[in-house]
Amino acid sequence: MCIRDSVARFARQERFRNRIVLIEDYDIAIGRLITSGSDVWLNNPRRPQEASGTSGQKVILNGGLNLSVLDGWWPEGFDGTNGWAIGDDRVRPDTPESDKADADALYSILETEVADEWTRRAKGLPKAWIKRMRRSIETCSPLFTSHRMVRDYALELYR
């Protein structure tokens, strides 16, 4: 069974209806649209499975905030004020208990921090959200550039 068929099978289940989107033929143009239109970029692969996280880096340049596991680039980029981290950086076994711990951490952050900052508004503006956006741009944009990516690949991968 291919991935598309598996996703379609899950998406038909009542508990997943209207909650799963599979983007076929994902390319640069689609990636540009998604990263430019996201307020929060959720990235939750199993640690340590994140390849790099360039989509999360692009979101920052568009004013989006990252809500991610501490893997890939995020352990270096996250400082506690410029987005949100899901759980800690421990690599856990692939078990239902690990999934539950990650899910609990994600829902807790969404309910107590993300939603609160987005909905709490002074004079119509989410001041805490805007502060976090600015902090994200200020702290991450200078660190994660295409020049650095090429340099890192050249130094670490192609030695």
Residue ranges of each PLM-predicted region?
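Active-site donor-binding acidic/aromatic loop of nucleotide-activated sugar
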Residues: 18-27
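Short, conserved catalytic or adaptor-binding loops enriched in Gly and charged residues
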Residues: 9-15, 76-78
